[in-house]
Amino acid sequence: MLRIAGRKLSSSAAARSSSAFFTRNPFTFTDDSSSPTRSPSPTSLASQFLDQFRGFSSNSVSPAHQTGLVSDLPATVAAIKNPSSKIVYDDSNHERYPPGDPSKRAFAYFVLTGGRFVYASLVRLLILKFVLSMSASKDVLALASLEVDLSSIEPGTTVTVKWRGKPVFIRRRTDEDINLANSVDLGSLRDPQQDAERVKNPEWLVVIGVCTHLGCIPLPNAGDFGGWFCPCHGSHYDISGRIRKGPAPYNLEVPTYSFMEENKLLIG
């Protein structure tokens, strides 16, 4: 009886498999030639193969908690044994490290504070170096001022010195020169200015020897007023360096100067 039941089960299973094959098989046969009425196209076969492959690949790269294949393995081991393009997160690993030693934290704070202090000091030095590099050098400062010895200048004479690339006239005036400079009517001057405003010591007159017209150098002890005469365009200056005649619009410029001693003059 058991053998007969087994044979019946095997025959029914074979019948179901054959019927399923003919159901899925795209080929149909006719009674006359027993040949298929149509042949499968390569594109249909390729599409069916790709569908099966995609389904297999999607199932193979599904997350670990869905497949259950590597549920008992760590995330790293599961990723090696079951390669997947999806990112699998290990939600079970929440290890927390204990806080560090207080002495080590204090040392770390000390190192960081020291590093910041050194960094700030270096930045400060760089800024100071940059600012100091923009200031004038000692040579330039030396040329900016000029010290002149007045002891060798005789009364009534004029000495020319060079300061900042320009000639400077230093005249030691006599009493007659001083009285003549103070007797001039300011209303008659083109650039009105009293003699006391142009000198710090009435005996000494210090002016820049450049004509205010076009920058020529006037000649001392010349002209119609006993001061300076510009040969370029005929400008006349008096004994105080004021313009009295000619095209020059202004008086000779007075530089910044001071008396260091009785016979020492510092220009600049």
From Swiss-Prot:
Top-level class of the enzyme under EC nomenclature: translocase
Pfam family, one: Rieske
One BP term from GO: mitochondrial electron transport, ubiquinol to cytochrome c
Protein's cellular compartments: Mitochondrion inner membrane
EC number: 7.1.1.8
Superkingdom of the organism of origin: Eukaryota
Keyword Repressor attributed: no
Cofactor note as given: Binds 1 [2Fe-2S] cluster per subunit.
Regions crossing the membrane: 106-128
Topological relation to the membrane, as annotated: Single-pass membrane protein
Mitochondrial intermembrane face of the membrane: 129-268
PANTHER family attached to this UniProt entry: CYTOCHROME B-C1 COMPLEX SUBUNIT RIESKE, MITOCHONDRIAL
Additional observations: The Rieske protein is a high potential 2Fe-2S protein.
Binding partners and assembly: Component of the ubiquinol-cytochrome c oxidoreductase (cytochrome b-c1 complex, complex III, CIII), a multisubunit enzyme composed of 3 respiratory subunits cytochrome b, cytochrome c1 and Rieske protein, 2 core protein subunits, and several low-molecular weight protein subunits. The complex exists as an obligatory dimer and forms supercomplexes (SCs) in the inner mitochondrial membrane with cytochrome c oxidase (complex IV, CIV).
Protein name per Swiss-Prot or TrEMBL: Cytochrome b-c1 complex subunit Rieske-5, mitochondrial
